[in-house]
Amino acid sequence: VYSYLNVSTFGNKSLCKHEEDHDPADFREDLIDSLFEKYPQVLRGLKVRMCKETLGDHGISPLHAGIEMSEHLKAKGYHCPVAIHYDDLPENVTVKELFGTMRKDDVIAHVFQTKAETIFDENGKIKDCVWDAKKRGVYMDDCHGRVHWSYPNLQNAFSQSFYPDIISSDLVRVSEYT
C-alpha cells in the first residue's frame, strides 16, 4: 500500500467539513520529513486539497508550499510528486493557474468534477491549459466516487479524446456504499 501525505498537519479530520489548516505557515515540514524518513517505502508524495472550503484567503499559496516541500524531499532522494484534490475553487484561484503550476508526474484528482470552474471552457471544449498540463506529463485522475465526479463531463472529455491517466475510486464514508 502506498500513500500520499496531506500537507495539512492534521489532515482531513472530519466527515463532511474539510477543516484542514491550509495556512502554509502552519505546515510542519519537519514532521513531514521525519515521516518520509520513517516510511520511505510507503509514502509516495504529498497531497494538497485545492477547494474553497480549505483554501480560504490563502489562494494558490498552499500548493506552492507543497511543491516547495516536494522539491526538498526529492533533493533528499525521496519519490515525491504532489497530488491535488481539485474541486470548487475559490475566486482567487483559476484552473489556468492551478493546472499551470503542476509539474511532470504531479497528479490532479477529480478532473471531471462539476463545481465552479471546470476543465471546460464556455463552449464545452477542454481548456488549453488542461491540454498543456497533460502534455507536460501531469497525470489526470478521474478519482470517481459519489461526489467530485460527473458522467456527462467524462463523456464530453472522451468525445474530445481527453482520457484520464489514472482511474481510481474516491471511497470515503459518504460514498463507500452508494
Labelled PLM ranges:
Residues 1, 40-44, 76-80, 104-106, ...:
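Short, well-ordered coil/turn segments that N-cap beta-strands
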Residues 1-50:
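Divalent-metal coordination cores built from histidine and acidic residues
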Residues 1-7, 68-77, 130-137:
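Alpha-helix-loop-beta-strand connector modules within alpha/beta enzyme cores
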Residues 3-5, 84, 142:
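Structural beta-sheet core signal
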Residues 11-15, 54, 116-117, 176-177:
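A short acidic, helix-capping loop that chelates divalent metal ions and anchors anionic groups
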Residues 29-38, 93-102, 154-160:
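Short amphipathic alpha-helices and their capping/turn segments at secondary-structure boundaries
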Residues 47-127, 144-149:
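Divalent metal-binding pocket/active-site signature
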Residues 104-107, 112-178:
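Active-site-adjacent C-terminal substructures of enzyme catalytic domains
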